[in-house]
Structure formats: structure tokens, C-alpha cells
UniProtKB/Swiss-Prot annotation:
NCBIfam families per record: pup_AAA
Organism: Beutenbergia cavernae (strain ATCC BAA-8 / DSM 12333 / CCUG 43141 / JCM 11478 / NBRC 16432 / NCIMB 13614 / HKI 0122)
An example Gene Ontology biological process: modification-dependent protein catabolic process
Name of this protein: Proteasome-associated ATPase
Family: Belongs to the AAA ATPase family.
Keywords recorded for this protein, A-Z: ATP-binding, Chaperone, Coiled coil, Nucleotide-binding, Proteasome
Gene: arc
Function description: ATPase which is responsible for recognizing, binding, unfolding and translocation of pupylated proteins into the bacterial 20S proteasome core particle. May be essential for opening the gate of the 20S proteasome via an interaction with its C-terminus, thereby allowing substrate entry and access to the site of proteolysis. Thus, the C-termini of the proteasomal ATPase may function like a 'key in a lock' to induce gate opening and therefore regulate proteolysis.
Domain notes: Consists of three main regions, an N-terminal coiled-coil domain that binds to protein Pup and functions as a docking station, an interdomain involved in ARC hexamerization, and a C-terminal ATPase domain of the AAA type.
Length: 560
């Protein structure tokens, strides 16, 4: 018994051993758990990577249409397929031409955007609301579908669109600078009241343009058709372009008055009441055959589109002789033989040209093809003359106004009345410009018959010259103020500006062909064979003269 009692350890010692063993096992278990967790995470990560690299390739397609059974028609690799759609894809919100993603089972699993690149085609004709006839490379024509974001947009004939050739979808409108730069589509803010010295011409234009638009019922009652176009011709700088802009502004106001009288026109929000298509004539010419004619067709297609909404449209051809000169008169080319017929076909061809007014401006109307000038095309021909003394006063009053700073000495001379002072300035300036004194002699011309005539500066005056004179006077006043003088414009500033303007124009008539120069300047009649310029000092003393005869001048070649 005593021996057994000796072999036993105390209970507290055995418990401590068991506790140490349990703690050791727990620590090992934790380390094993952590290792297993890390291994499991690595396995999961490796499995994900393996799945990622072994995933079958996905493909993209273009959505075409949805069906009631939850399937969709798509174009994939040039083939049209009907595929299932995953529940996560909002089928009702997909639009034609939109990209969709397909999985390996050829199921639509995601929606994308629209193709941002592609070939460029030009719209030739719109077919319904979702199709168009376009022209591509080598003038190949095809019918295409408008992608979802183009449906309902203002797609026009002549617009450039990107296309995906295999599906036939067009996605995006691309700005074409070569077309947009040729036509300036704007609503001018020039009124007839802003034009001076052309009251008779303005009255003739209003009778020709505004009456048919304001009273179409009376014209129909009398069997009278409104004019299709008008020609403004005359010397440079006399207001032809300004009149054309005023016509567009006046038509806009006329349309607004007509709507107020009970004939409302349904226009899009923000749409203008008139459009002014300013065609840059020389830039319209293109070295490629048929391009100029195509641009003319696009211009009139745009005009018809605007006019179809009941909006008056003015198509303005400045420097008209550069585009539509008489057929057969070309020296180095014969482009006019096809350009002129294209314009004639647009003005009075099979397609009607309602609410569109064609206005041409030229200072060489003798070079324009007669077929364009005949009645039925450019019906009204209005000559814009050089201003006489009364017209010059009217033009001066548009630029030299009482609101400008006037010099105190000049104000004191006329009772401190700004309006009276300005009127006196204008009278002095007009008297200086239109004087037939020797200091105003400009040219001596000799006609083919041997007759001679002295021309004065007043014979070459224009509205642009008057505006330039007023601007010079303002500059003189500013320079005097900066030099330490008093503020304001003086009569002396205006008279000095007149003399400076005359001096700058003395050498301009020295051309190799005086007769052509005279025609452009508005001097028509017998052929001029000799020009002698009369050069003046500021005091009016003749200091010399320069003569030039047609027969004695070596004319350069046609390409120089």
C-alpha cells in the first residue's frame, strides 16, 4: 500500500501537464487553421485567375429589334441573328444600332454604347423617319438605317454620317467644314433704317419681295406669281450686301406680323423667322468636276428644308459674276457651262422653290449669263447708284450722330446744339466732297471717239467711302485728345478725313485696262481708251499727272 502511494503524483501537477498539452495542441490547431485558410484563399484566387484566363472569348453585336417573347434581333459579324436576352438586360430600353455584349452561349448579357468610328457617307435623301439614301465611296448609293440617337434628330440632306458597312447603321453626324464654310446661315440684324441714301431702291425691293409674302391671297386672286429672285448691281461699296441682309431682316418681321394676324406658323422652339444663306461665291469653285454643282444642290436643298416650315429664306450670291458668267467666255476653263445650268434648274426646275428668294449682287452684271437674268429667274433688277449729295447727307447721318463727343468750340459756334452742329459738319463735308473746284478733279478720260471728260471725286463716291471718312475723323479726334487737346470731333477733322481719303484713291485707277476698271467703277457707256490721273496737293495745286493708254501698255499673259 505504501508503495502504490509513492508512485502517485500530486493532482495539481498532473492538471498542469494536461493544461500545457492542451494549450500546445490549441496553438498548433490555430496555426494549422491559419495555414488552411491561407491555402484556401490561394486556391480561390488561383481558381479565379484560371477561370479568367480560360474564359471563352465574348463577342459584340448591334441591336436591331426586340420581340415579345424576350428575344432580340442583332447583327453579329455581318449576320442577322435572333438571340436570347439575359434577365439583367433592360430589353425595352435598347435602341437600334446600340452595341450589346454576347456570352459564349450567344446570349445578350450586357448593353453598351454606339460605335464611335466608321466610314463617312453623305445623305442624299431621307426615307421615312428611320432610313436614308446615302452616297459613299465611288458614288455608291445604298439605303441605311438611322441608329437610335439619330432618330428624331434634324438629319438633313447633305449631312455627313458615320456608317458601319456590314450592318447598314449610321451612327453620328460629322461636321463638314467644306460645306458649312460655304454657307453662312444666320438671321441678320440689319434694318432698312440702317441704310442711307437708297430709299428708291429699298421701296422697289419691298414691293418685289415683301408684298407677295405678306399678301399671298391677293397675288393668287390676281394670278400673279411672286418673283423668284432679284439682282442688285452697281459700283462697289454702295450697299448691295447691306440691302440683301436688310431684306432677310424685313422678311422676318413680315412673317411675325403675318402670324400675329391669325396665321400662326408652327416652328420648332428657338427657330428663327427668317434665314440668310450667304454663299461665298469664289470659294464654291472646286477643281474636281461636279463638286461645285453638288454644293449648289446642297445649298438649295437646305433652303427648301427651311422654307418648308413656312420660314422665308434668302439665298444671297455675292460677286455673282465669279460663278455664273456667260457660258463660252472662259479663258482657261469652261466650268460655267455646267454651273449655270445647275443654278437655272434649281431656280425654275421641276422642284418648286416656295418661300425662297434668290438675291445676286454684282458690279459686272454684263458678265453674268443672260439666261439667269431673264424674267422668271432674277425677275427684278435694281441698280444701286453712287450716292448724290442728298444721299450722301443721309449716309453721313447714319455714322455721324449727335451722341458722339463734339468739340466744345464747334458746339459754341452753333449755340451748343449737338444736332445742329452735326448737321453743319455734314453739310461742310458734303460740300467739300461734291465740289467741282479744281482741287476735286480726279481723272481725265478719253473716249474712243476722241472726246475728253474730267471726272471728279464725287463721281466715285460710295457709302463705304463715307463711312471710312467718318471713321478717319473719329481717329483724328482721338489723336488730338491724346496729344493734349480737348475732347470731341471738329469740322476740321471731317474735312481733313475727306482730303486724306481722296489722296489715297489717286493712284487706284492706274490699271492696264481702263475700260474694264471703268465698268467695275460704274462708269458705263463709250469705251475708254486713255486715262490721265490728276494728282493734287492738299492746297489744290496740280503737281503732275500720270497718263496711261490702252494701246501703249504691254498686257501680261492670261496666267499672270
Amino acid at each position: 500500500m505504501s508503495q502504490q502511494h509513492d508512485d502517485r503524483r500530486p493532482p495539481d501537477t498532473a492538471d498542469r501537464d494536461l493544461a500545457r498539452q492542451a494549450t500546445s495542441l490549441a496553438e498548433k490547431n490555430e496555426r494549422l487553421t491559419a495555414a488552411l485558410t491561407a491555402a484556401r484563399a490561394q486556391l480561390v484566387e488561383m481558381k479565379a485567375q484560371l477561370e479568367e484566363v480560360s474564359k471563352p472569348p465574348g463577342s459584340y453585336a448591334y441591336f436591331a429589334a426586340a420581340h415579345a417573347d424576350g428575344t432580340a434581333d442583332v447583327y453579329s459579324a455581318g449576320r442577322k441573328l435572333r438571340l436570347g436576352v439575359a434577365p439583367s438586360v433592360p430589353l425595352a430600353s435598347l435602341r437600334p444600332g446600340q452595341e450589346v455584349q454576347l456570352n459564349e452561349a450567344m446570349t445578350v448579357v450586357a448593353a453598351g454604347g454606339y460605335e464611335p468610328v466608321g466610314e463617312v457617307v453623305t445623305v442624299k435623301e431621307l426615307i421615312g423617319s428611320d432610313r436614308a439614301l446615302v452616297v459613299g465611296r465611288a458614288d455608291e448609293e445604298r439605303v441605311v438605317r438611322l441608329a437610335g440617337r439619330l432618330i428624331g434628330e434634324n438629319v438633313r440632306v447633305g449631312d455627313a454620317l458615320t456608317i458601319e458597312p456590314r450592318t447598314g447603321f449610321v451612327f453620328e453626324r460629322i461636321p463638314r467644314s467644306e460645306v458649312e464654310d460655304l454657307v453662312l446661315e444666320e438671321v441678320p440684324d440689319v434694318a432698312y433704317a440702317d441704310i442711307g441714301g437708297l430709299s428708291s431702291q429699298i421701296e422697289a425691293i419691298r414691293d418685289a419681295v415683301e408684298l407677295p409674302f405678306l399678301h399671298p391671297d391677293l397675288f393668287r386672286e390676281h394670278g400673279l406669281k411672286p418673283p423668284k429672285g432679284l439682282l442688285l448691281y452697281g459700283p462697289p461699296g454702295c450697299g448691295k450686301t447691306l440691302i440683301a441682309k436688310a431684306v432677310a431682316t424685313s422678311l422676318a418681321h413680315t412673317a411675325a406680323r403675318r402670324d400675329a394676324d391669325g396665321e400662326p406658323a408652327e416652328l420648332p422652339d428657338g427657330a428663327a423667322r427668317s434665314y440668310f444663306l450667304n454663299v461665298k461665291g469664289p470659294e464654291l469653285l472646286n477643281k474636281f468636276v461636279g463638286e461645285t454643282e453638288r454644293h449648289i444642290r446642297l445649298i438649295f436643298a437646305r433652303a427648301r428644308e427651311r422654307a418648308s416650315q413656312g420660314i422665308p429664306v434668302v439665298v444671297f450670291f455675292d460677286e455673282m459674276e465669279s460663278l455664273f458668267r456667260t457660258r463660252g467666255t472662259g479663258v482657261s476653263s469652261d466650268v460655267e457651262t455646267t454651273i449655270v445650268p445647275q443654278l437655272l434648274a434649281e431656280i425654275d426646275g421641276v422642284e418648286r422653290l416656295d418661300n425662297v428668294i434668290v438675291i445676286g449682287a454684282s458690279n459686272r452684271e454684263d458678265m453674268i449669263d443672260p439666261a439667269i437674268l431673264r424674267p422668271g429667274r432674277l425677275d427684278v433688277k435694281i441698280k444701286v447708284e453712287r450716292p448724290d449729295a442728298e444721299a450722301a447727307r443721309d449716309i453721313f447721318s447714319k455714322y455721324l450722330v449727335a451722341d458722339l463727343p463734339i468739340h466744345p468750340d464747334d458746339l459754341a459756334e452753333y449755340g451748343n446744339d449737338a444736332a445742329t452742329t452735326v448737321a453743319a459738319m455734314i453739310d461742310r463735308a458734303v460740300g467739300r466732297m461734291y465740289s467741282t473746284a479744281p482741287e476735286n478733279e480726279f481723272l481725265e478720260v478719253t473716249y474712243a471717239s476722241g472726246d475728253k471728260e474730267v471726272l471728279y471725286f464725287k463721281d466715285f463716291n460710295s457709302g463705304a467711302m463715307i463711312q471710312n471718312i467718318v471713321d478717319r475723323a473719329k481717329k483724328h479726334a482721338i489723336k488730338d485728345l491724346l496729344a493734349g487737346g480737348r475732347r470731341g470731333i471738329r469740322v476740321d477733322h471731317v474735312l481733313e478725313a475727306c482730303v486724306t481719303e481722296f489722296k489715297e484713291n489717286e493712284d487706284l485707277p492706274n490699271t492696264t485696262n481702263p475700260d474694264d476698271w471703268a465698268r467695275i467703277s460704274g462708269k458705263k457707256g463709250e469705251r475708254i481708251v486713255f486715262i490721265r490721273t490728276i494728282v493734287q496737293k492738299k492746297s489744290g495745286e496740280t503737281v503732275g499727272s500720270v497718263a496711261r493708254a490702252v494701246e501703249n501698255v504691254a498686257t501680261p499673259g492670261q496666267y499672270l
